[in-house]
Amino acid sequence: AGGGKADTVNGDGILVLDRNGKKVWQWSVFDVCDPFADAELEKHKKDWMHANSLSFDVDSNYLLSFYNLGQVWKIDAHSGRVLWKLGKGGTLRMPAADVFSQSHAVHIDPAGSLMLFDNGVGRKQSGVFAYRIDTAARSAAVDWHINLPAEIYNDRMGSAYTIDDSLVLCCCSKRHITVLVNKKGEIVWTLDTAIPPYRVEFIPAALLKPYILD
């Protein structure tokens, strides 16, 4: 792996606190992975796996996205065991053409699919994937997929969330742009910003109404 005795490997974890700030549960990548088994550890030691999103699956276990690995892990919220790994070199079978290339904003969408913003680093084109996970078959299949226009390719950061059955709100952070697209990837609305937004989420008007002054 390289390096010396004084080197530090920075990893990621999950910390659960109660409302009083007391630790309830803790998990670390070092509990389940040996950094010295990574042949490229010297290259990534300052940010070994780069976790960038944490959310709940429908069964209340954790979904954790690792940018540097190009994977999403499902982690048992009680034992800390890694239940499966989705993505490049993962434990769930899927066609090579359906594998995302680095991801952000992993979550379960309203239809129950695992949805993520695909940075598309390998293809130099970003997009959105929604997968159906078959835990019994240890496989993943694409529910739907959108390719965003090549001119707003976004290799870092970003997010994607459905607004309804036909529209998806996508944030291309490094391009300083948020777009509303249909399931064909066609842009129907655009918001340009002076700063790079890390993530953009849709808030229904009903939730905003109490805070809007007439």
Segments (PLM) and residue ranges:
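Histidine-/acidic-rich catalytic cores in large beta-rich domains
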Residues: 1-214
